[in-house]
């Protein structure tokens, strides 16, 4: 996560956490915006600073009528992907990897212990050698905060 941000490169098989968000760095809030989305928004003519601010509160593009559907389908975030789909991706890579695959399975804030147990069981059944789950909002002082993730 953090190293890929510093190096401005992909974080492996992880989907985007958010299209735009505010990151807390040394008690300062900084905007982080996916550069490919920014370029697309400008090229397609729907960019505005006001839109970026709204997207940074939500993280995803869902619910923004001014953004074309084909763009929304490309820029999907980790919270829009089901835990099962996250595990399927990890399992697909695990088939060709001797060691464990590093991948976060994002869970909604309201995820229960049974949801977590189900994710571990599915990962085991799919042949994953390890699994990391993160329930959004479960860790106080999270460096990235979105207003509208459930």
Language-model segments: what does each one mean?
Residues 2-150:
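Catalytic alpha/beta core of large soluble enzyme barrels
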């Amino acid at each position: 996560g953090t190293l890929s941000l510093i190096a401005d490169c992909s974080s492996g098989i992880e989907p985007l956490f958010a299209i735009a968000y505010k990151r807390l760095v040394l008690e300062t809030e900084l905007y982080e915006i996916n550069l490919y989305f920014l370029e697309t928004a400008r090229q397609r003519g729907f960019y505005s600073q006001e839109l970026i601010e709204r997207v940074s509160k939500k993280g995803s593009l869902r619910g923004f009528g001014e953004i074309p559907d084909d763009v929304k389908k490309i820029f999907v975030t980790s919270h829009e992907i089901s835990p099962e789909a996250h595990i399927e991706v990890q399992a697909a890579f695990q088939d060709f990897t001797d060691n464990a695959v590093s991948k976060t399975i994002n869970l909604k804030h309201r995820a229960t212990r049974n949801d977590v147990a189900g994710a571990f069981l599915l990962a085991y059944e799919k042949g994953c050698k390890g699994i990391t789950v993160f329930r959004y909002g479960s860790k106080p002082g999270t460096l990235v905060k979105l207003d509208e993730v459930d």
